[in-house]
Regions:
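Hydrophobic core residues within well-ordered beta-strands of beta-rich domains
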Residues: 87, 114-116, 183
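Primarily extracytoplasmic ectodomains and periplasmic/lumenal surface modules that are beta-strand-rich
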Residues: 96-100, 121-129, 194-196
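Low-complexity, acidic Ser/Thr/Pro/Gly-rich terminal tails and inter-domain linkers that flank the onset
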Residues: 69-109
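A short beta-strand signature
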Residues: 109-126, 139-142
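Surface-exposed edge beta-strand/loop patches
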Residues: 2-66, 148-149, 155-156, 165-245
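Short, solvent-exposed beta-strand/turn "edge" segments of beta-rich domains on protein surfaces
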Residues: 97-115, 128-134, 174-178
Length: 245
């Protein structure tokens, strides 16, 4: 199962840029009319700007209200459309534990640590014919873990530092990839022991996506989550975790 955000990325990005351009030109006409004390130019510029902003806003909100929340099962892929190619994210493993780190210096959780292993893949089947084999650095990402009560948890710096002491490498979701390449990244969250129905949200961390029609970050749009239910446990020889309390 796969989901993509935003759908028809080249179209909606061009629509956004076109709306910005027309609005900017209209405002220049408005300013020209004000400077020349011309009511005609002022009305044309102001009316055009208001029409474009209102029309774009209605379309953006309409598409958002028609969206529905998605929770992808383990193994499902969430794609981010980078105009001429797609970067996919999928949960490949989960581990819950009360402490992380080497036996001589473990970091204990106030509740419990949840380690989520995410696979990041540059899907070579989604590139345009003219793209080539050059590396792509994904846009900035925001990551949170949510539970059944709507509580959100950011990655735990203490937990990730403890895991880093065991694994000896960190990496990030922003590592550049060539078409067909992939890597796995362990994300560590600290949650209360009563947290249930956990699901992972990975989304873009760019402010302009709020204004992109059909993007999950846009106003009133529903999110696409990666579910953790039935995820395989992370192999301990790869990521040795302390037993949970």
């Amino acid at each position: 199962m796969t989901e993509t955000t935003p759908h028809l990325a080249p179209v909606v990005v061009l629509l956004f840029l076109g709306a910005v351009f027309v609005t900017a030109v209209s405002l220049l006409v408005l300013l020209y009319g004000a400077a020349r004390r011309s009511r005609l130019y002022a009305r044309i510029g102001g009316g055009a700007a208001a029409t474009v902003v209102a029309g774009y806003g209605l379309l953006l909100c309409g598409v958002s209200l028609a969206s529905s929340e998605q929770v992808l099962p383990v193994g499902g892929w969430k794609y981010f459309c980078e105009i001429d190619c797609h970067i996919g994210y999928s949960v490949s493993g989960v581990e819950t534990t009360g402490a992380l780190g080497a036996e001589t210096g473990q970091t204990s959780a106030r509740g419990q640590f949840v380690v989520v292993r995410v696979k990041v893949w540059f899907d070579e089947h989604t590139i345009s014919r003219n793209r080539g084999d050059g590396p792509l650095t994904p846009n900035a990402r925001r990551v949170v873990l949510e539970d059944a009560n709507g509580r959100a948890y950011a990655p735990s710096p203490e937990g990730e530092a403890a895991l880093l002491g065991v694994k000896g490498e960190a990496g990030s979701l922003g590592e550049p990839l060539r078409p067909g390449q992939s890597f796995e990244k362990d994300l560590v969250f600290e949650v209360p022991k009563d947290a249930s129905a956990l699901r992972l949200l990975i989304t873009e961390d760019d402010p302009e996506t709020v204004l992109i029609i059909g993007h999950e970050n846009s106003l009133l749009h529903r999110k696409i989550y990666l579910g953790l239910d039935s995820a395989p446990r992370i192999a301990r020889e790869i990521s040795p975790l302390a037993p949970g309390h």
